[in-house]
Structures are given as C-alpha cells and as structure tokens.
C-alpha cells in the first residue's frame, strides 16, 4: 500500500507512544522485546547455526525471527541491530504482507515496503536518540 513519509512517521510515533519508547529504551531492549508479547508480538531468536542467513531477520504473522547473535546485539544496544529490529517491527505495524512485485514497472518509493520499514525504524531510533543511516538493500530478481 502506498504511504507517504509523513504517514510512515506518524505510524512510528504512534507506536513509540503506545509502547512507551523513550531515550533509555536502547539500554533495556531485552525488557522491551519481552513486553511485546503482551501485544501478541513474539520475538523468536533462532540458533545461529540454524539460521539460513539469507536475511538479517524476518517477520510473519506477528512473529519476528532473528539469529541469536542479532538478538544479543540488540540487547547490547548496538544501533545497527536495533535498527534491524525496528525495521521488522515496522513491517508488522504497517501491515505489510510478503509478496513479490510482479510488474515490469519498478514500484514507486511510496509503494516500497522496505523503504517504508526503513523510514519507520529511523523515526523510532530518532526518538531514542540514535542516529543511524542504513545501507538500503535492493533485491533484484531476474
């Protein structure tokens, strides 16, 4: 679904208010992730040797899966790891569904679920006082 940047940012701000995200949340990410269970969102760390490493993390049906090493980095407060976590949470909160883009025409920026999730994550990290700019990954299927 196409979303303008202000719509994505408003969704992220609403989430941060509802979940009580503050500047010190990055120091308590283990507790924060645990509390998401109260909202029906499950965090599922997977043993690193069982993780397929085709993606850094993934979400589906209110479950965010990630390798244990990423979970540990999130708990340690690493900005990149926290960005990845909120990127995945953004997919859930913005109602993204997993699908492939079947068209000869590239999706617009507003239609790009990855761009939306990045902007969502950047907005929340900004509320936490974290400045992190990710490298955008583009997957091209031939």
PLM feature spans:
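Active-site hotspot residues in diverse enzymes, especially metal/ion-binding acidic/histidine motifs
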Residues: 1-142
């Amino acid at each position: 679904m196409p979303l303008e940047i202000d719509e994505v940012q408003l969704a992220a701000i609403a989430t941060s208010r509802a979940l009580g995200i503050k500047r010190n949340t990055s120091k308590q990410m283990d507790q924060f992730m645990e509390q998401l269970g109260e909202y029906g969102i499950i965090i599922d760390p997977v043993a690193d040797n069982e993780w397929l490493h085709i993606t850094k993390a993934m979400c589906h049906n209110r479950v965010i899966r990630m390798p244990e090493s990423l979970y540990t980095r999130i708990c340690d407060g690493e900005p990149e790891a926290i960005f990845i976590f909120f990127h995945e949470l953004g997919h859930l909160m913005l109602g993204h569904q997993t699908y492939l883009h079947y068209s000869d025409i590239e999706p617009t920026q507003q239609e790009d679920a990855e761009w939306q999730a990045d902007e969502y994550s950047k907005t929340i990290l900004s509320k936490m006082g974290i400045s992190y700019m990710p490298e955008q990954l583009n997957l091209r299927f031939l």
